[in-house]
């Protein structure tokens, strides 16, 4: 039996048909990803609702092979792999039913400080919106200098939020809709690198994952779940920012 919680957590995300909610329920019920696999055959007796299809899904050697490759990337690039059992995992996010059971992080920050907010908005930011970001973040730097500011590194409001935070020496984290083997959009790479000293880049996605449309919706639940409040600066009536706020 493998006793690496990180490896087992990654493998669990790759087991077909388990999903975010199912994976978290298994870990919450049994205690760890290691124990989910170690007690696979006894799960129906230990956890109500676990049936033979779940047992079959957990018998997935390919998931462990892929997880091993991911851990090689993590260690080679000095990334941090956070599982639900880690004290440094975002505590607010851990309380969400669909919290990811593993996160990948590059940077330096405390996700569990007293105040964490996210600022999001349209990719077609107006001059007013850009100035609001700068002014609001500056005011925060005076009133709550230890606040962590979260956004998504996207065009428009997101990137202006990150740059405003950097300008005021505040910690800022971008939650990404792809793996840490790339930066999207690439034009924001310099800002992303600048964030690593006091903030960083966070994702639930494995390397090789493209920034596909549905990944942004999944990403938004992390942005909202790890924060105390969501501030929508500008948004279309059906924009992704309002999905985050909801």
What do these predicted regions represent?
Residues 1-139:
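Short, positively charged patches
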Residues 1-3, 83-246:
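Glycine-biased, small-residue-rich flexible motifs in mid-sequence functional cores and linkers
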């Amino acid at each position: 039996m493998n006793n690496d919680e990180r490896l087992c957590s990654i493998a669990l995300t790759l087991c077909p048909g388990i999903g975010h909610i199912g994976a978290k329920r298994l870990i919450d019920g049994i205690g760890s990803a290691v124990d989910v696999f170690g007690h696979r055959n006894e799960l129906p007796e230990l956890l109500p609702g676990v049936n033979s299809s779940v047992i079959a899904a957990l018998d997935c050697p390919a998931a462990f092979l892929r997880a091993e490759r991911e851990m090689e990337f993590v260690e080679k690039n000095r990334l941090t792999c956070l599982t639900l059992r880690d004290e440094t995992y975002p505590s607010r996010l851990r309380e969400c039913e669909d919290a990811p059971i593993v996160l990948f992080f590059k940077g330096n920050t405390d996700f569990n400080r007293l105040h964490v907010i996210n600022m999001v908005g349209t990719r077609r930011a107006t001059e007013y919106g850009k100035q609001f970001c700068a002014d609001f973040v500056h005011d925060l730097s005076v009133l709550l200098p230890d606040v962590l500011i979260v956004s998504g590194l996207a065009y428009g409001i997101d990137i202006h939020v990150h740059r405003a935070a950097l300008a005021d020496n505040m910690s800022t984290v971008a939650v990404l809709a792809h793996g840490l083997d790339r930066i999207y959009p690439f034009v924001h790479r310099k800002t992303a690198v600048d964030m690593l000293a006091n903030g960083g880049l966070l994702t639930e996605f494995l390397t090789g994952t493209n920034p596909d449309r549905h990944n942004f919706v999944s990403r938004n639940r992390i942005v909202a779940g790890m924060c105390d409040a969501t501030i929508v600066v500008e948004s279309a009536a059906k924009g992704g920012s309002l999905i985050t706020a909801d």
